Each structure stands twice: as structure tokens, then as C-alpha cells.
Amino acid sequence: MAVKIRLRRMGCKKAPFYRIVVADSRSPRDGRFIEEIGYYNPITEPAEVKINEEKASKWLQDGAQPTDVVKKLFTQAGLSK
């Protein structure tokens, strides 16, 4: 099973926020996920990012691949692979 760390869109139309989740790469963007490890709100100024570093590190060590946007968020938060 290929596991990805990616964003799951939440919120209203034109007012999105995102949850950072660990999911099977075959499931849909807003579908089934394994675990929630944080959130990202791009609407606030400055953008708000909260990541549970313990869970994120565990999943990265287990081989989960972050998407490009999540990789950028991890770098900004000081969490690198």
C-alpha cells in the first residue's frame, strides 16, 4: 500500500482550509484517510500551519511520501526528511 501525506480540503466555497492527512494514494482527495496529523489555513494573515511533529516524523520514517505542497509546509515548519 503506497501511503501519501497530503492535504484534504475542508471549509466553505471560496473559504478553504486544509487538513494534513496520511492516506492511501488510491483514495480520493477528500475520501478515506488513515490519520490526521495537522492543518493548514491559507486564508489567515499570515497563513496558519499546525503539524504534529511526532506523528509526521513517524510516518516519514515508515516511508510515507509527502506531496509537493506538504513538503513545502514541512520545510517552513522546520520539519525536514
Swiss-Prot record:
GO annotation, cellular component aspect: cytoplasm; small ribosomal subunit
One Pfam family from the record: Ribosomal_S16
Domain of life according to the entry: Bacteria
A GO BP entry: translation
Gene Ontology molecular functions: structural constituent of ribosome
InterPro entries for the chain: Ribosomal_bS16 (IPR000307), Ribosomal_bS16_dom_sf (IPR023803)
UniProt keywords, alphabetically: Ribonucleoprotein, Ribosomal protein
Ribonucleoprotein among keywords: yes
HAMAP family registered for this protein in UniProt: Ribosomal_bS16
NCBIfam families to which the protein is assigned, alphabetical: S16
Family: Belongs to the bacterial ribosomal protein bS16 family.
Name of the protein this chain belongs to: Small ribosomal subunit protein bS16
Source species of the chain: Clostridium botulinum (strain Eklund 17B / Type B)
